[in-house]
Amino acid sequence: MSLGLNAVYVASHWDAVTEGAAAAGREAPSRSEWRIVRDVWVAETDEEAREGAINGMLGRAWREYLRPLFSAGAYPFVSFMKHDESMSDDDVTIEYMMENLWIVGSPETVTEKLRNLYHTVGGFGHLLWLTFDHAEDSEAYETSMRLMAEKVMPNLQDLTGN
């Protein structure tokens, strides 16, 4: 699963899919079947999106649960979140994740970030938007979903994974 991982590492997941298919004597599936998981937050402006991501449930879930979980154990998952292996684990902050791993911004920024992700990983067919319980601010969540549906996705129809 691509949850919270840097795009270059996620791209290697497709290599594992094709290698596994070959080892099983099967034809590799189409990239259009590949699903990529990303944390997404869209608002009218980049500033509003950053504020909503950091101070809303997205930031809270990573700050209080996922980031600590990914740092635990003998093989901390946090190492796959870094864009540079020489980074300290402590440098993988919520702000770092928002800038480098999450898809956060205005509709224009989110469109650009999703295009960049698509090209970095070599193409995919489905974006799975990881979401959390936004009951405390359902209006902002609904706005984010609406902007994604109405302002972002129509501009990405050419990205089919083929």
Where are these regions (language model features)?
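Active-site-adjacent structural elements that line small-molecule/cofactor binding pockets in enzymes
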Residues: M1-N162
